[in-house]
From Swiss-Prot:
Protein's recorded name: Transcription factor 23
Name of the gene: TCF23
Domain remarks: Both the bHLH region and the C-terminal portion are essential for inhibitory function.
Organism field: Bos taurus (Bovine)
Cellular compartments per GO CC: nucleus
One GO term (biological process): regulation of transcription by RNA polymerase II
Top-level taxon of the source organism: Eukaryota
Molecular function per GO: DNA-binding transcription factor activity, RNA polymerase II-specific; protein dimerization activity; RNA polymerase II transcription regulatory region sequence-specific DNA binding
Amino acid sequence: MSQREARGARAMPGLGQSPAKATPRLLAGTERKRSRLSRRGQDLWEESSWSNQRWSRTAPNPRGARARSLARGRSEASPENAARERSRVRTLRQAFLALQATLPAVPPDTKLSKLDVLVLATSYIAHLTRTLGQEMPGPSWPPFLRGLRYLHPLKKWPMRSRLYAGGLGCSGLDSTTASNSGQRTKEAEAGPHVSGEPDALLSTRQLSPAPSDK
């Protein structure tokens, strides 16, 4: 073995040995590198997780704070809101009961909804307006009020469909009332002529000479 070969063997110790002895050393070196890399990655992950936890503790969530403030406001103002709502409902109910009491021919124990009371009250007001002759429905009136006829509560209740149909002017009540009113006007116009016939007969009898004078 020459001096050059000996120097190369010293520089590269694995070359002069058998492959069975060189492989365990290589495997041990790779395992050391892997363990070092895994330790570094674990340290980095622990540091990042610790920083995230610390940030989450120091910086509160704005949504959570807002929700808590809203919940506190609701819990504090809920009794006042509930009392205000109860008083509003009570006042509204008393007003509707008073309006129902003013409607004619409605028994006090009759159960009517708010919409029923409003329809009956509107139709009754329209009937009174037409009866007094202060203001007749014209083209400026809404179509709902133009077609209104007075609806008797006992005749139309509890037939809700006919109640609202009559209030809207879609039922046969409007045609019957119109025909009855037209017939009454015709009779009123023909009344003086019929009543004037007996007076004319009496006047002719008085003007004719009596048979005893001849």
